[in-house]
Each structure stands twice: as C-alpha cells, then as structure tokens.
Amino acid sequence: MSDQPAQSDLPDQGALPPQEAAQPQAVREDPQPQQCAQQVLFEQQGAQHRVYISNLSQDATEEALTEFLKDFHPVSVLIPSQSVRGFQKTSVRPLGIAYVEFKDADTAAKVILELNGVTFMDRELRLRYHIPFKSEKEKLARGPNKFRQIQRRLSELRRRNSDAGATVTTDNGPQVDAAAVPREMSKVTIYVGRLPGRTTDKDLRTYFHEYLPQEIIVFKHRQFRGWRIRRHVTAAVITFPDHERQESALESLSNLPFNGRTVRMAPAFEDKLAEIRAEVQRMAVEQQLPQPASNLGIYIGNNLIAMQPLQTRKADQQSLQSQHSPQNAAEDQTITAPPPSQQQLPQLQPIAPPLSLQPLNPVENTQPVQGLDLSIPREHEEVVRGQPLLRLQKLQMIQRLQRLHRQKQRQQIQQEPAAQPAAQPAAQPATEAAVAPQLVPEQEAHQAAAQAEPQQVLERPIAAGA
C-alpha cells in the first residue's frame, strides 16, 4: 500500500487531461462486463490496489476465493461477516462481499476486466475498485456534489466524442456550451409547458382558435430534481399556418392563464419536434390507428412513453346498417313466439311486433333492468346467443323472452284446474255405485259367521259328554 506508482504509469490514464484525472470518477455498484473498460477509466485519484467483490456466495470462504484468484497472486483476501444472536445460540453469517488486495494497480485493473461477471460457486461476481470511507467533515470539505461532478465529466466526454455539441450539466443546472452548435428554432410551431394534467388537444384548439392551429400534440415528459425526486410535466407542441400567427400567439397569450394556471410558451426546437412526430407516427403504425397524428395525444416519458388517444371516433355507417339488415330482421322475427289461442286465454294481450320495429326508449328500458334476473330459458338460449345485437336490444329481448316464459307457465296453471272439476262429478256416482254392491255381501258374510260361532261352541261340550 505504501508503494504508489506514478500517475503516468496507470493504464488508461493517458487518454485524460491532467485537470480531469484529479476529479472523482463514477463508480457503479453493479457494472456490466462490457462496461468494465469505462469503470477502469473512471478510477479515483491515485493508484488502486484493493478490489471490492459483491454477489459472493454465502458458502464461499477466504481459502476458496484465494484459490480462485491464484493466477493473479492476491496479497490478502477478506470476507467480512456478522454475528446474529438468537435465543439459545449465536451464529456467524457472511455478508456476501469480499475485499481483495493485489501487489500493484495493473493487476487490480486486469482482475476487474477479466473476472467481472464470471461465475464463482453458482454466482456471477461483481467487481469494482474499493472506495475508502470518508467522514462527514471530509465530504463537506470536498466541495460540490460528487454526483454532479461525475455527470459533468460524462457530458464533456460525450461532447468531445460526438460531432454536434450538446448541453453540459453544471452545478447551476443545464447550460448550453459556447462551443456547441445552436439549436434551430421552428418558425411555425410553439412549445407550451406546465399544462394541467388532464389537458386535451380539444382544450388547446379552443384556446388558440383565433390563430387557426393546424397540428396539436399533447405529451408528458419527466423532470428530475435531485437523485430521487421526479415529476411528470404535461406539455404540447402547436403548429400554426405561418410565422405571423405564431408570433401573434406568443405575444398575446404568453402572460394569460390557461385553465387557472400560468403556462410557458416559446418557439419549439426543430430536432425535438421531429423526434416527437416520428414517435407519434411509429406508435400509430404499431397500434393501427386510422386517425392522423394531429388528433392523437401521447405520453412521452424520458421523452417518449405510452399513447393516449384524446378523441373518440364516430360509429361507422356500415356497421349501423349491418345491424338493421334484412337477415337480422328475420332473426328477430324468429324470436317472437306465436300468439296463443283466444279460446283458452282470452284475457292475454296480443304479442308485440319484432324488436327491429320497436322504438328504443332508454329511459323506459333501463329502469326495470336494475333488479332483473338475466337467466334465459333453455328453449330460447341458442336463439339469444346467435343475435349480433346491441346491449339495449339484448336487454329488451331478454325481457321479452322472460315474459313469454311466464305467460306459458300461467297458461299451463290455468288449464290444469279447469280440466279436473269437469271429470270429477261424472266419475263420483260411478265409483259409489261400484263400491256399494261390494260392501253388502261382505257385511252379510260377517253376520252369518258371527251367528254360526256360538252354535259350534255349544255343540262341542255335548259331543264330549256323550
């Protein structure tokens, strides 16, 4: 640890300027194997000999890990553990991490590049440089936020590697670099930000109706305020016929509230506008939506997320005509039962015309449906399932079938009592006449048997005495 090599001897340090090498570098908890080169590039100031290993198996020991790293000749291997106290005994459990120290920085960098993501005891190892602990006083004395410094350095590296300039993130917020190419502003499209969350393109079209807006796209994007604070902001881009109407809208409506909220208006960027339109077209093709992009509302998070249609389409005339086709009318007629004979049930009302000829009255039909039993009689179940009708027509048809079923039950109940009293008066005398002759011989036989028994009893003693 005491032998520190020179700054020029470090691998990958020659690609960085001297003023950037002294800045703290980005370190990720779980880097991917393909990102190891970037991680070695973003090492801390000075040489690093100690490597931090995470996602280590609970069964791994220091001897097994030393044997696994024997090709790199580790100086020391440490697997920290913790003591868990129970009611009867205390157990020691490893933390699943390890600290391995090597003899030089080149070996540590080679270990990170080659073994990051390698499986050891059924676990993929995660390797990075060890970050020494620093007290709160050292953190306060360090100056600006480390995360912002890392973001600024990454932005500078991206800007140097790209042909076109981009924004550079500083401590005071996003600022445009002086060497970057200025972004082109649209001459007919404006950006409207800080809109209410439920704003639709119809509301904006009404608000800008004097300036004849041609295209309105509503979207949402995320704003990051710090490491954990995020919020969604509703915005829109509005395209006008010419540059004069764009300037008039910006001058007259910039300071006026929209639905009780002060909005932000400015000319839109051409590159951002092209990105939004391309995303709208792509999502429209994927979802196979027939309406144009100007009638669509979208959510764009991180500047592009899910689709939100803002207008409903009118019903197709062909679908309405197909519902009232002659074939459906013939099927409706098959549902109606034949009228009962007037001789049996003169009090029943005549059957109503088919459903296709009846006027639809939602007020009349929706009230009794609340407590309605939607069970369909078995004899009409197949007919109901084959009808491509609307919801209101289906409810009317179910009511009609249930009324027919109840009428049929009442008809059967009324016919059965009417048949029984007519047959009983004629059958009753015949049964009495048939039973009466049978009772007379039986009574005479019992009387004769009763008279004959005493005589037999008296005759037996006489015969015995004789």
Swiss-Prot record:
RRM domain mapped to chain residues: 49-132, 188-270
Signal peptide (UniProt feature, chain positions): none
InterPro entries listed in its UniProt record: Nucleotide-bd_a/b_plait_sf (IPR012677), RBD_domain_sf (IPR035979), RRM_dom (IPR000504), Rrt5_RRM1 (IPR034244), Rrt5_RRM2 (IPR034247), RRT5_SRSF_SR (IPR050374)
Origin species, per record, is Eremothecium gossypii (strain ATCC 10895 / CBS 109.51 / FGSC 9923 / NRRL Y-1056)
Which GO molecular-function terms appear in the entry?
A: mRNA binding
| Annotated family | Belongs to the RRT5 family.
In which residue ranges is the amino acid composition biased (Low complexity)? 17-26, 410-456
Biased-composition ranges, Polar residues, are 317-336
Q: Which SMART domains match?
A: RRM
A GO cellular component annotation in the UniProt record: nucleus
Q: Which PANTHER family match?
A: REGULATOR OF RDNA TRANSCRIPTION PROTEIN 5, RNA RECOGNITION MOTIF RRM DOMAIN CONTAINING PROTEIN
Name the record gives this protein: Regulator of rDNA transcription protein 5
Instruction: Classify the source by domain of life.
Output: Eukaryota
> Which keywords annotate this record?
Repeat, RNA-binding, Transcription, Transcription regulation
Tell me what gene encodes this.
RRT5
| Main function | May be involved in the modulation of rDNA transcription.
Q: Where is this region: Disordered?
A: 1-33, 311-347, 406-466
* Entries under Gene3D superfamilies matching the protein: 3.30.70.330
SUPFAM superfamilies registered for this protein in UniProt? RNA-binding domain, RBD
